[in-house]
Amino acid sequence: MKKDIHPVYQEVEVHCACGNNFKTGSTNKEIRVEICSQCHPFFTGKQKNVEKGGRVEKFKKRFGM
């Protein structure tokens, strides 16, 4: 491999909009995210299960079947 052409991989701190901070490895100096595992609905258990239905359900609803 060639020397001095690869970016420096270092430990950085990730800042979430909810206020949570954690460390990870990256070539960037700082990372800011809007959603992390502490505030995402899937990981917190607050997700909503929305079922829209398919084409058949829309057809039946439209024509009163």
From Swiss-Prot:
GO terms for molecular function: metal ion binding; rRNA binding; structural constituent of ribosome. SUPFAM superfamilies: L28p-like. Zn(2+) binds at residues 16, 18, 36, 39. Keywords: Metal-binding, Ribonucleoprotein, Ribosomal protein, RNA-binding, rRNA-binding, Zinc. InterPro entries: Ribosomal_bL28/bL31-like_sf (IPR034704), Ribosomal_bL31 (IPR002150), Ribosomal_bL31_A (IPR027491), Ribosomal_bL31_sf (IPR042105). Pfam families: Ribosomal_L31. HAMAP family: Ribosomal_bL31_1. PANTHER family: 50S RIBOSOMAL PROTEIN L31, CHLOROPLASTIC (PTHR33280), LARGE RIBOSOMAL SUBUNIT PROTEIN BL31C (PTHR33280:SF1). This is Large ribosomal subunit protein bL31. It comes from Alkaliphilus oremlandii (strain OhILAs). The gene is rpmE.
